[in-house]
Amino acid sequence: MAVKHIVLFRFKADASAETVKEGTSRMLSLKEGCIHPTTQKPYIKALTGGKDISIEGADNGITHAFVMEFESIEDRDHYVNNDPYHAEFKSWIISYLEKFIIVDYEEGVF
């Protein structure tokens, strides 16, 4: 069953516009850069994202949102625990983030 992986960022106030642009570009590059160890092909089914534009005032300071889709929990687990491209990105971006939130779910499972 497909797994959605939602990632929310709040960049630090002193993060430059260039850093934010690089961070969001690198986040989106995960779709092609994360390679499955068995198939040797990209395994993130979908990845979209953008800057928060909500008018509801309930963003808690979150500035950017991304939604990924994986084919299975196993693929999501590999991404989180073992993917070297993802690990390198996490190491780089963490110093520019004030806050991040990650939520995963299987569609229709409540």
What are these regions (language model features)?
Residues 28-35, 86-89, 97:
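A common structural junction motif
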Residues 82:
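Short, surface-exposed ligand- or partner-binding patches at beta-edge/loop junctions that are enriched
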Residues 1-63, 67, 71-78, 104-110:
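Short S/T/G/P-rich N-terminal loop/turn motif that feeds into the first structured element of a domain
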Residues 76-79, 89-92, 96-99:
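C-terminal structural segments of small proteins and small subunits
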